[in-house]
């Protein structure tokens, strides 16, 4: 645990780490999250898990149906003190800062399995997996930065960065095995996977320190909020048809197989940044309450301007198909021959 009454946590994620991704409507400062981080009084690490399963017998033939599930949740806090220094090739130091970083990692894992056997010939299996991870932190740094505190004569200032990376993976798999005849067998399956990578409402604020020790909000697009979303839908299919052949050894290994696999993927990424001009006047640092300056009332009063940048995006669609044929023959008692043909097609 990271003990302390003033452990900082950014606003915008619930207990399970799922984040609020809503963006403001045009010309309104109605962001869903505060610029001022929350204070967590008792940031205790904790975790818990659940598991269970059962088997049933269905119908007159008492076909077995079984399921099993396991789920876990964890939340871990950490606090670090940091020293950040950078210089150019000549040795001149342009960054010399000390800071504090308050981090929280929230994770969930869910696994599920459902299996059904029909008449001891056919089987149907469903697998589910969910992995969710939210890594968020609040970082506060004070000191010299020659690039980002140019409003200060000696390049001194304060920087607060609040960032959350919210990632989710959901996997669904359905697999079946069908014994059509004594010699003919069909395996078929499909999976649908979803990936989401979110960075909602990253908040960066810079303040420059004047020679008299007071602070002002830094200009030149040093007050910003950033949103990005990556989504992927991934569908996979496969089918194998196997016909067993008779050989002189009655090995059961000789066969011919025909199969197909396909993959269909859609990727979409979108990112946008909001920039704010500096609200004029001195800023109190104890406590630092930026919501008193950046709000909808001050925007409408003309104390600062808000600019929404151009949306950066890309989209990729992939279609992948492949087919194959394979033959296996028991040549001798301890020698098996195998030959196959594979055809691959890719369209992006």
Each language-model region and where it sits:
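Short, solvent-exposed beta-strand-terminating loops
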Residues: 1-18, 72-84, 133-137, 195-207, ...
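N-terminal, post-signal-peptide soluble/periplasmic segments
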Residues: 1-44
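Short intrinsically disordered, low-complexity coil segments enriched in acidic
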Residues: 1-19, 101, 158-163, 255, ...
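Outer-membrane beta-barrel proteins
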Residues: 26-45, 93-109, 157-170, 222-234, ...
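Transmembrane beta-barrel wall of Gram-negative outer-membrane proteins
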Residues: 31-139
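Intrinsically disordered, low-complexity coil segments
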Residues: 57-64, 144-153, 246-251
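Flexible, surface-exposed loop regions and adjacent strand-edge segments
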Residues: 81-93, 140-154, 202-212, 272-282
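Face-selective signature of the C-terminal outer-membrane beta-barrel domain
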Residues: 115-133, 161-348
């Amino acid at each position: 645990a990271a003990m302390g009454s003033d452990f900082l946590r950014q606003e915008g994620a619930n207990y399970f780490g799922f984040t609020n991704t809503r963006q403001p409507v045009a010309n309104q400062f109605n962001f869903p999250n505060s610029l001022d981080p929350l204070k967590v009084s008792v940031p205790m690490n904790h975790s818990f898990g659940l598991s269970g399963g059962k088997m049933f017998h269905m119908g007159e033939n008492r076909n077995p149906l079984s399921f099993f599930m396991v789920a876990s949740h964890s939340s871990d806090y950490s606090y670090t003190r940091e020293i950040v220094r950078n210089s150019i090739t000549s040795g001149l130091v342009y960054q010399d800062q000390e800071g504090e970083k308050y981090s929280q990692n929230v994770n969930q894992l869910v696994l599920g399995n459902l299996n059904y056997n029909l008449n001891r010939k056919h089987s149907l299996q469903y697998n589910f997996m969910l992995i969710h991870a939210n890594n968020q932190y609040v970082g506060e740094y004070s000191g010299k930065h020659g690039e980002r505190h140019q409003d200060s004569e000696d390049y001194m200032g304060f920087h607060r960065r609040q960032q959350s990376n919210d990632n989710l993976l959901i996997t669904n798999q359905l697999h079946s095995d069908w014994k059509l005849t004594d010699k003919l067998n069909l395996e078929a399956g499909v999976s649908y996977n979803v990936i989401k990578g979110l960075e909602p409402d990253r908040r960066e604020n810079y303040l420059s320190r004047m020679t008299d020790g007071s602070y002002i909000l830094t200009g030149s697009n040093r007050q910003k909020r950033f949103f990005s979303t990556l989504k992927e839908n991934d569908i996979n299919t496969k089918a194998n048809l196997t016909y067993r052949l008779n050989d002189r050894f009655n090995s059961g290994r000789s066969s011919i197989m025909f199969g197909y696999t396909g993959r269909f993927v859609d990727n979409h990424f979108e990112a946008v940044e909001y920039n704010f001009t500096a609200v004029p006047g001195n800023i109190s640092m104890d406590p630092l309450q930026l919501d008193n300056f950046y709000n909808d009332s001050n925007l409408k009063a003309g104390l600062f301007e808000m600019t929404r940048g151009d949306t950066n995006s890309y989209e990729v669609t992939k279609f992948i198909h492949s087919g194959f044929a394979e033959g296996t023959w028991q040549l001798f008692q301890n020698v098996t021959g195998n030959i196959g043909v594979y055809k691959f097609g890719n369209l992006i």
